[in-house]
């Protein structure tokens, strides 16, 4: 393979796309976790003044939101592991790593937003009707799975570049 053909498949800007995917995975998934934590935390602090004994049971949305940032961290570590200053980095790998980061990032952002909305209203209604707890947890699980789907797609995409 000639140098000009190698430069065509591994241009100098290709690693930028990989770094952008790494950053997008962390930034967007942590933003989703922060939104979910903030929105559900507002509801928890609201019920804490009336029924402090319900605070520990109401922390489930906050914990579920925190897990979203772990999804972004896992994908970011995998992307960073594929970046090397001594090896050629193809344009395909750059776009693939960008797609990995955006996939998990936007999925976790949407998941965090939905966890925040359900968590906020759920804990407020749980204060009035404790029988709603199981239904709220099920809805939170379905909202959490959205972020997991993004991570699964990112992992599948990442294996395409290493295989």
UniProtKB/Swiss-Prot annotation:
GO cellular component: fungal-type vacuole; vacuolar proton-transporting V-type ATPase, V0 domain
Topology with respect to the bilayer: Multi-pass membrane protein
Listed Gene3D superfamilies: lithium bound rotor ring of v- atpase
Lumenal side: 1-15, 80-97, 157-163
Residue spans, topological domain Cytoplasmic: 37-58, 119-135
UniProt keyword list: Hydrogen ion transport, Ion transport, Membrane, Transmembrane, Transmembrane helix, Transport, Vacuole
Transmembrane segments: 16-36, 59-79, 98-118, 136-156
Coiled-coil annotated spans: none
Annotated site residues (Essential for proton translocation) in this chain: 144
Predominant subcellular localization, coarse grouping: membrane
GO molecular function, one term: proton-transporting ATPase activity, rotational mechanism
Function: Proton-conducting pore forming subunit of the V0 complex of vacuolar(H+)-ATPase (V-ATPase), a multisubunit enzyme composed of a peripheral complex (V1) that hydrolyzes ATP and a membrane integral complex (V0) that translocates protons. V-ATPase is responsible for acidifying and maintaining the pH of intracellular compartments.
Similarity section: Belongs to the V-ATPase proteolipid subunit family.
Name of protein: V-type proton ATPase subunit c'
Source organism per UniProt: Debaryomyces hansenii (strain ATCC 36239 / CBS 767 / BCRC 21394 / JCM 1990 / NBRC 0083 / IGC 2968) (Yeast)
């Amino acid at each position: 393979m000639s140098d000009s053909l190698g430069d065509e498949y591994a241009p100098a800007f290709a690693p930028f796309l990989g770094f952008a995917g790494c950053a997008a995975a962390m930034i967007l998934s942590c933003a989703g976790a922060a939104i979910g934590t903030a929105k559900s935390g507002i509801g928890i602090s609201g019920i804490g003044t009336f029924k402090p004994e319900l605070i520990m049971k109401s922390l489930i949305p906050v914990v579920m939101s925190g897990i979203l940032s772990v999804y972004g961290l896992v994908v970011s570590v995998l992307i960073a592991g594929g970046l090397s200053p001594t090896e050629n980095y193809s344009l395909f790998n750059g776009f693939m790593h960008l797609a990995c980061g955006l996939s998990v990032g936007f999925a976790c952002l949407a998941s965090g937003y939905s966890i925040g909305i359900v968590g906020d209203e759920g804990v407020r209604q749980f204060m009035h009707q404790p029988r709603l707890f199981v239904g709220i947890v099920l809805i939170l699980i379905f909202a959490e799975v959205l972020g997991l789907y993004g991570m699964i797609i990112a992992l599948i995409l990442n294996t395409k570049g290493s295989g």
